[in-house]
Amino acid sequence: MTQDELKKAVGWAALQYVQPGTIVGVGTGSTAAHFIDALGTMKGQIEGAVSSSDASTEKLKSLGITVFDLNSVDRLGIYVDGADEINGHMQMIKGGGAALTREKIIASVADKFICIADASKQVDILGKFPLPVEVIPMARSAVARQLVKLGGRPEYRQGVVTDNGNVILDVHGLEILDAIALENAINGIPGVVTVGLFANRGADVALIGTADGVKTIVK
């Protein structure tokens, strides 16, 4: 199977967690896009969705799914999203698509985080994929200096402005042995909006696309 076929398989497999009559949290990226396609087949059974990016919102609306503002929603049963890396502790690096802040906010509200990914995203140690950090523009250089002190090589993601109007620093060269400590440290740097480490709030279920089918891992 191609990588895209594996992504499609896990996107559709996540439908089993969608309860009729609920509002579903929806992520961003190529794997989440397959889940949105699948969710379109249930649009008459669900109340709607909360979306983590403008791109996902457009796709949801194009399929006739109502998109709610998170402020109008009391709780979410599930949040379904992909990952750039996921380790054995269900901790993830996310933010390759620059939607990390909204993704993290929605994940924090959901009862259950379902990560959908192909097997290439599974790692023993996080950090080979550059760690995205969303930063207030005026703080870019100051934050970069602090990230160097933490052992990383920050690189400004040229030409990218987040849906929140901020910029992204991608931090290379990290071997993340204590993801929770690093998440807390980076989030504590003035000017950082959030870091794409999902360790304090990791995944509850991972659906991993493999050549042998979809593998389910439960925390």
UniProtKB/Swiss-Prot annotation:
Disulfide bridge map: none
UniProtKB keywords: Isomerase
GO biological process, one term: D-ribose metabolic process
UniProt-listed InterPro entries: NagB/RpiA_transferase-like, Ribose5P_isomerase_typA_subgr, Ribose5P_isomerase_type_A
Listed SUPFAM superfamilies: D-ribose-5-phosphate isomerase (RpiA), lid domain, NagB/RpiA/CoA transferase-like
Superkingdom of this protein's organism: Bacteria
Pfam family, one: Rib_5-P_isom_A
A GO cellular component annotation in the UniProt record: cytosol
Reactions the enzyme catalyzes: aldehydo-D-ribose 5-phosphate = D-ribulose 5-phosphate
Matching CDD domains: RPI_A
Active site, per annotation: 103
GO molecular function, one term: ribose-5-phosphate isomerase activity
Assembly and oligomerization: Homodimer.
Protein name, entry field: Ribose-5-phosphate isomerase A
Annotated gene: rpiA
